[in-house]
Structure formats: structure tokens, C-alpha cells
Curated annotation (Swiss-Prot):
Annotated function: Involved in the biosynthesis of the osmoprotectant glycine betaine. Catalyzes the irreversible oxidation of betaine aldehyde to the corresponding acid.
HAMAP family: BADH
InterPro entries to which the protein is assigned, alphabetical: Ald_DH/histidinol_DH, Ald_DH_C, Ald_DH_CS_CYS, Ald_DH_CS_GLU, Ald_DH_N, Aldehyde_DH_dom, BADH
Protein name: Betaine aldehyde dehydrogenase
Lineage, broadest ranks: Bacteria, Pseudomonadati, Pseudomonadota, Gammaproteobacteria, Enterobacterales
Subunit structure: Dimer of dimers.
Gene Ontology terms: biological process: glycine betaine biosynthetic process from choline
PANTHER family xrefs: ALDEHYDE DEHYDROGENASE-RELATED
Residues at which K(+) 2 binds: 246, 457, 460
Pathway annotation from the record: Amine and polyamine biosynthesis; betaine biosynthesis via choline pathway; betaine from betaine aldehyde: step 1/1
Active site per UniProt: 162, 252, 286, 464
Keywords associated with the record: Metal-binding, NAD, NADP, Oxidation, Oxidoreductase, Potassium
Residue numbers carrying Cysteine sulfenic acid (-SOH): 286
């Protein structure tokens, strides 16, 4: 028997057997152990979830703003009370270090839910005077039933990022977690029910993106899809959504983000920022600053500081709280990252450190790849052009501000960017020219609930978090009122 046993679908406020009974395994990437069997949804299950959501959504939307706010705040309290339990599940399912999941994943997800719970009473329309006898007022009404499709790197955090604004605005959600990391989304559904969310307002369907995800994006009963994943999948989501019922779409599709270090930067601080921008979560973060631009005159000194820091990384069992670097999410993904590393070697980049999978002792049973740093990289190399989503840093040298801005923008992505400098005039001047939706000055990676998150170019459509996202889960109804007479031309 696996550690977490058989996991059913969550529909209409309860665990429910799938129509087919087909299952797939959840695997701990630290040791290859099967930790759960998950039921795979099919078209019947999708229809059932949509029907439940359609029934529950009007009940939820009819509650007062304060009632909805109180229920979501109760969910926040339960999340925080169960933080350690959820962190342990997340670590087993993703391979992320417990030191990380315990302090970040559930904590930041709960913060987002609390933020939107507080905004619910502030969601209001406008009154617009026209003339003495007439005015217009607007209402912000929920879209109805919406779908969220998550990625595998931050399972419960992404589920909360998507569900919090949707529920706050009065919608019902059907959430499909990544088939690689599904367990905590099911726990979140339990928590919402325990907090008092009406049945059918939050449902979880597990299964593959090619099947369940496509069914959701094409379903005529769903008004909006919020998707996190890769560009190729995002294009399919947009095409399916437009080809079915012209659904509203929000997408975050990853990046190949530049981190620019200027000559006046504190080099120790710059190295620390570059480490966090490349090796946190074993490099499996969509906003990673994997293209690190360094002035040619500082390159050797910077590289020395990076190598020193990489050697201090504590790689090991993610359930050991001393570990700060765990395995990649799956063996398949490990192999993909290794192919990129091999490509970097073939194309002539200089390997400073790492560049291999870890196979000594207990690590041999897991999907571990050593933190890897390449230097003397060129802009046309595969490791510089494509999103690797792993612990691979590329160091590139430059000569001038104008040059580095041009090269930083030379990518199809536009998710994130950052600069490290003591000259704030330069910092703002450069940031304003970088084609990226999320930018950091002298820091990297933090995204507070108040901060809209999303990308330019191929990195996405729309934003998550912040006030504007709440509004995007509503539709505006305009009503004109005439208090005086009405004159017809007929």
C-alpha cells in the first residue's frame, strides 16, 4: 500500500470515484517510491464537475460579500494550522526541500487567499451621472464557472493563486493540477469544504493535461480558463478556448529571464541574488534569471564567488531540514535537463561547475542533477535561448548598457528581469527598457499578493495576483436609468 493510498476526484464537496476507475501513480522523485494512486478523470467526470459547479455557483454568489470573506478567511486559518502536514505532502510529491515547502509554499498561498478575502467587500460598481433625469450604474458580476490548470512546480500555491480571486469574485472553479504533482490540490478542496464553501464551488479533477485539460478548455459550460505551463501547451489552450466558446484566458507561460549586474554592484550581493535566481527550488521556477549578464571586467571575480557558493549548497534528502537543494520533479524532467547540459557542452560553453546527474549513495535513487554553471556563453546557444527549468546558470559578458539591454530583450520570452546596481537612476532607466512583466532591482524572486504577476510577449496573457486580477474574474453590466420622460421618434 502506498503512503497516501488511492486518491479520488473531488466533485460537489466530496471525494468521488471517477467514471472509468483508471489510475496513475504519484512518484516521490527523491527515491522513486510510488506514494499514491490517483484516479484519472474523463469526459463524464468533467461534465459532472461542471454540473456541480453550475449548481453551487449561484448559491455562493448570492451570499453577502462579508459571508464569502469569512469563509475564505476560515480556509486561511485551516491552511496555516495544517501547514506542516501540507508541506510534508508537497515535499514527498515534488521533491522540494521541506525547509522550503514549510516556510514558503503553503505560507505564501495562504497569504494570497487572505488578501483576496479582504478585497471581497471592496468589489463594487460605479454610478455615472448623465443628466438631471438619467444616470448609469455598473455591476461587477461573476463569470460563472471557471477552470484553473496548474503547473507542477508550486502545486498548492498555484491552486490558491487561481482559486482565490475566482472564488472571491463569486465564481465556482474546477481545478486540474499537474498530473505530476496533484496531491495538495485535493487537500485544498477538503479545506475549502471544511471552511464552509458550498458544495460544487471548488472541484478538483486529476488526470493528464492532454485529456482533462483539453476537455476543460473546450467545455461550453466554462467561461474562463487560467493556465500555467509551457508555450506550446498555452497555444493549445488559447486555440481550444477560442474555438469552443470564446472563453476568457489568462496564461503564465514561463521565461528565459535576464539578470543584469552592473559594474558598481556589490559583487557579493550580486552573487547571492544570482544564486537565488538560479538554484532555488532546484532551478524549477518560471521567473528564474538564468541569463546572467556580467561586465567583462568583473566576470572572473563574479564567477569565483558563484563557484564558492555552489560548493556550499546542501544537496540531499528533501525531508531533511538541512537540505536546501532537492531532486528535480521527475526522472523524465531530469533527463530533459541533462540533454540541455549536454547541449551546452557541445556548443562550446565553458563548464565552471556541475554538469552531471548525482548518483552517489542514496541520491542514486532520485532525480538529482548537480547545480550547473556555464560561462563564455553566446546568445545563440540552446541553453541561452530555451527555458530549461532546471539548475543551469548561463553567464554572459557585456561591454555597454546599450548592448546589454538589446541582448536582454533578444528573446521570445518576457516574464521577468532584474538589475543589480547602486545607481538607482540607472536601475530605473534600464528596467523601463526591459521587455518583461515582473522586474526586480537589487533583489529577486519575491512576489507579494499585491503584486500583479505575468509576462510580456510569449510569456503569457493577463496577470495573476493584485487587484486587477480580481476584476478579471468578473464581467461588467451597465444599466442606464431614466427618471424623466421618454421621447420616441415614431
Amino acid at each position: 500500500m502506498s503512503r497516501y493510498g488511492l486518491q479520488k476526484l473531488y466533485i460537489n464537496g466530496a471525494y468521488t470515484d471517477s467514471a472509468s476507475g483508471d489510475t496513475f501513480d504519484a512518484v516521490n522523485p527523491a527515491n522513486g517510491e510510488c506514494i499514491a494512486q490517483l484516479q484519472a478523470a474523463n469526459a463524464q467526470d468533467v461534465d459532472k464537475a461542471v454540473a456541480a459547479a453550475k449548481q453551487g455557483q449561484p448559491v455562493w454568489a448570492a451570499m453577502t460579500a462579508m459571508e464569502r470573506s469569512r469563509i475564505l478567511r476560515r480556509a486561511v486559518d485551516i491552511l496555516r494550522d495544517r501547514n506542516d502536514e501540507l508541506a510534508a505532502i508537497e515535499t514527498a510529491d515534488t521533491g522540494k526541500p521541506l525547509s522550503e515547502t514549510r516556510s514558503v509554499d503553503i505560507v505564501t498561498g495562504a497569504d494570497v487567499l487572505e488578501y483576496y478575502a479582504g478585497l471581497i467587500p471592496a468589489l463594487e460598481g460605479q454610478q455615472i451621472p448623465l443628466r438631471g433625469s438619467a444616470f448609469v450604474y455598473t455591476r461587477r458580476e461573476p463569470l460563472g464557472v471557471v477552470a484553473g490548470i496548474g503547473a507542477w512546480n508550486y502545486p498548492i500555491q498555484i491552486a490558491l493563486w487561481k482559486s482565490a480571486p475566482a472564488l472571491a469574485a463569486g465564481n465556482a472553479m474546477i481545478f486540474k493540477p499537474s498530473e505530476v504533482t496533484s496531491l495538495t490540490a485535493l487537500k485544498l478542496a477538503e479545506i475549502y469544504t471544511e471552511a464552509g464553501l458550498p458544495a460544487g464551488v471548488f472541484n478538483v479533477l486529476t488526470g493528464s493535461g492532454d485529456q482533462v485539460g483539453q476537455m476543460l478548455t473546450e467545455h461550453p459550460g466554462i467561461a474562463k480558463v487560467s493556465f500555467t505551463g509551457g508555450i506550446a501547451s498555452g497555444k493549445k489552450v488559447m486555440a481550444n478556448a477560442a474555438g469552443s466558446t470564446l472563453k476568457d484566458v489568462t496564461m503564465e507561460l514561463g521565461g528565459k529571464s535576464p539578470l543584469i549586474i552592473f559594474a558598481d554592484a556589490d559583487l557579493d550581493k550580486a552573487a547571492d541574488i544570482a544564486m537565488m535566481a538560479n538554484f532555488y527550488s532546484s532551478g524549477q521556477v518560471c521567473t528564474n534569471g538564468t541569463r546572467v549578464f556580467v561586465p567583462q571586467a568583473l566576470q572572473a571575480a563574479f564567477e569565483q564567488k558563484i563557484v564558492e557558493r555552489v560548493k556550499r549548497i546542501h544537496i540531499g534528502d528533501p525531508s531533511d531540514e538541512r537540505t536546501n537543494f532537492g531532486p528535480l520533479v521527475s526522472f523524465q524532467h531530469r533527463d530533459s535537463v541533462m540533454r540541455y547540459i549536454d547541449s551546452g557542452k557541445r556548443e562550446g560553453a565553458t563548464l565552471l561547475i556541475g554538469g552531471y546527474s548525482l548518483t552517489e549513495d542514496a541520491l542514486a535513487h532520485g532525480a538529482y542533477v548537480a547545480p550547473t554553471v556555464f560561462t563564455h556563453c553566446r546568445d545563440d546557444m540552446q541553453i541561452v535561448r530555451e527555458e530549461i527549468f532546471g539548475p543551469v546558470m548561463s553567464i554572459l559578458s557585456y561591454q555597454s548598457e546599450e548592448e546589454v539591454i538589446r541582448r536582454a530583450n533578444d528573446t521570445e520570452y518576457g516574464l521577468a528581469a532584474g538589475v543589480v546596481t547602486q545607481d538607482l537612476n540607472r536601475a530605473h532607466r534600464v528596467i523601463h527598457q526591459l521587455q518583461a512583466g515582473i522586474c526586480w532591482i537589487n533583489t529577486w524572486g519575491e512576489s507579494a499578493p499585491e503584486m500583479p504577476v505575468g509576462g510580456y510577449k510569449h510569456s503569457g496573457v493577463g496577470r495573476e495576483n493584485g487587484i486587477s486580477t480580481l476584476e478579471h474574474y468578473t464581467q461588467i453590466k451597465s444599466i442606464q436609468v431614466e427618471l424623466g420622460s421618454f421621447n420616441s421618434v415614431f
